[in-house]
Amino acid sequence: MKCLRIFATPDGESHFGEVDIPTTLTRSFPNGAPAANYESSRSAFYEASRVRFVHIPAGAREADFHNPPGRLLAIWLDGEVEFETSDGEVRRVSAGKAVLVDTHGKGHISRHPPEGQNSIQVVLPHGLDAPSA
């Protein structure tokens, strides 16, 4: 499984990339009803220290270059957000998608839909580098 990420290079410029999240095919509910006993691909658990729910109000269209305070996974619940990195590349992220955002360097620009938007932000102290035990 892949997750979009925004990262900074040593010169501080931000860029897009992907994180490959390893998954394993496992039985979902082996002790449940036969209809619930299907196989699905699952990753290991990752340590999360905080979770918050965010509502971006209607009219809050653009957030200029910024970084979150820590390793953050943003999951968009509705609408579509547009990100721009300092190298000028622009990507759109639709509802249901997640982005691992940069924590240093020049940051990124976020552009939100005129009607507002909702997201969940999960602080991952170790990012997606190391699953928890």
Give the predicted meaning of each segment.
Residues A63-F65, F83-E84, R92, V101, ...:
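Short beta-strand His + acidic residue motifs that chelate non-heme Fe in jelly-roll/DSBH
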Residues M1-A8, E89:
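Short acidic, Pro/Gly- and aromatic-enriched capping/linker segments at domain boundaries
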